[in-house]
């Protein structure tokens, strides 16, 4: 358990005012995001069959919450980690065409999460996915989409400032781009990727770190990524320097999704070629699924960022270790 306690923390809003601000941010953002990105809202599952291969393996070691159902004997059901793969299949199932897309409210349980100021076992995010052409699977498409998302987030700052002027946290005016290898080259003295993210975000304010998942020159990965949804050459994280906690805050992980070639290449690198026999993977190999770009935007993270909160538990209801709750309360951090 890692917990940062900011000095002389002032939550600015009462718990009830915070709840009202959360409602406003969530409702306003999803409407503006959907409109700006050209996305339709759809309903999404909270759990899927393990045999489908649809669940997100995240970094590879997290185990999903699973159970069995009376009317589906012999089938293991898993609570989703994310909807990264499900969304791509939904675009096909619902008949979405080129440059059309969807977003959904995704709720997940990640029981193996390391709990801290930003991380909870309960995950709530806007999961989105959009159809692109094979020719658009490039860095230009990725960067243009990142710029669009940043524009919506920045506009939300002004919306919140108007409604809650004393509480809003001000954001930088521009997002910068750097690859994970360029970041390692820039800070050779910093061995930990998180330290490099903190350094670049403190310098530039907001950064999109690109190309996450593959091994760097150092022999290490910047961060783990499942080999079967993001193309590791065309993905990244949106990070903000977060002054209240003096570190980087990751708002979104996103990317252009694997095609039939990059998926096989990445599965070979991780030794997960056995997944190629699963339904989702077969559909990609057979070119039955559309080429897409997609990602997730943390709902609680966005609320935390825009309201300058010290702990994600101030903007979402979850469960936390007693020691963490005690320290938070002693320092004016009111956990819901």
From Swiss-Prot:
Its EC number is 6.3.1.1. It holds the Pfam family AsnA. GO terms for cellular component: cytosol. Its main location: cytoplasm. The keyword Secreted does not apply. It is found in: Cytoplasm. Keywords: Amino-acid biosynthesis, Asparagine biosynthesis, ATP-binding, Cytoplasm, Ligase, Nucleotide-binding. It catalyses: L-aspartate + NH4(+) + ATP = L-asparagine + AMP + diphosphate + H(+). Pathway: Amino-acid biosynthesis; L-asparagine biosynthesis; L-asparagine from L-aspartate (ammonia route): step 1/1. GO terms for molecular function: aspartate-ammonia ligase activity; ATP binding; catalytic activity, acting on a protein; transferase activity. One of its GO terms (biological process) is L-asparagine biosynthetic process. InterPro entries: aa-tRNA-synth_II (IPR006195), aa-tRNA-synth_II/BPL/LPL (IPR045864), AsnA (IPR004618). Belongs to the class-II aminoacyl-tRNA synthetase family. AsnA subfamily. PANTHER family: ASPARTATE--AMMONIA LIGASE. This is Aspartate--ammonia ligase.
């Amino acid at each position: 358990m890692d917990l940062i306690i900011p000095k002389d923390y002032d939550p600015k809003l009462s718990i009830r005012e915070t709840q009202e601000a959360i409602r406003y941010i969530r409702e306003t953002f999803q409407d503006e995001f959907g409109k700006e990105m050209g996305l339709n809202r759809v309903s999404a599952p909270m759990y899927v069959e393990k045999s489908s291969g649809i669940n997100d393996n995240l970094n590879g070691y997290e185990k999903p919450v699973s159970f069995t159902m009376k009317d589906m004997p012999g089938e293991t059901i898993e609570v989703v980690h994310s909807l990264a793969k499900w969304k791509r299949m939904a675009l096909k199932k619902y008949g979405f065409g080129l440059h059309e897309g969807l977003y959904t409210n995704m709720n997940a349980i990640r029981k193996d999460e390391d709990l801290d100021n930003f991380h909870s076992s309960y995950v709530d995010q806007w999961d989105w996915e959009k159809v692109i052409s094979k020719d658009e699977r490039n860095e230009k498409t990725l960067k243009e989409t990142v710029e669009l998302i940043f524009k919506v987030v920045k506009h939300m700052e002004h919306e919140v400032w108007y409604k809650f002027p004393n509480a809003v946290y001000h954001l930088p005016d521009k997002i910068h781009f750097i690859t994970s290898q360029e970041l390692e080259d820039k800070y050779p003295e910093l061995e930990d990727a998180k330290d490099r993210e903190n350094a670049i975000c403190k310098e530039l304010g907001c950064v999109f770190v690109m190309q996450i998942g593959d091994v760097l020159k150092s022999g290490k990965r910047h961060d783990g990524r499942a080999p079967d949804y993001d193309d590791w050459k065309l993905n990244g994280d949106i990070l903000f320097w977060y002054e209240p906690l003096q570190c980087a805050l990751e708002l979104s992980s996103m990317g252009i999704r694997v095609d039939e070639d990059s998926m096989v290449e990445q599965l070979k690198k991780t030794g997960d070629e056995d997944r190629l026999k699963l339904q989702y993977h077969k559909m990609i190999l057979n070119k039955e699924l559309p080429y897409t770009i997609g990602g997730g935007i943390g709902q609680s993270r966005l609320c935390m960022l825009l309201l300058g909160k010290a702990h994600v538990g101030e903007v979402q209801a979850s469960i936390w270790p007693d020691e963490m709750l005690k320290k938070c309360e002693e320092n004016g951090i009111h956990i819901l």
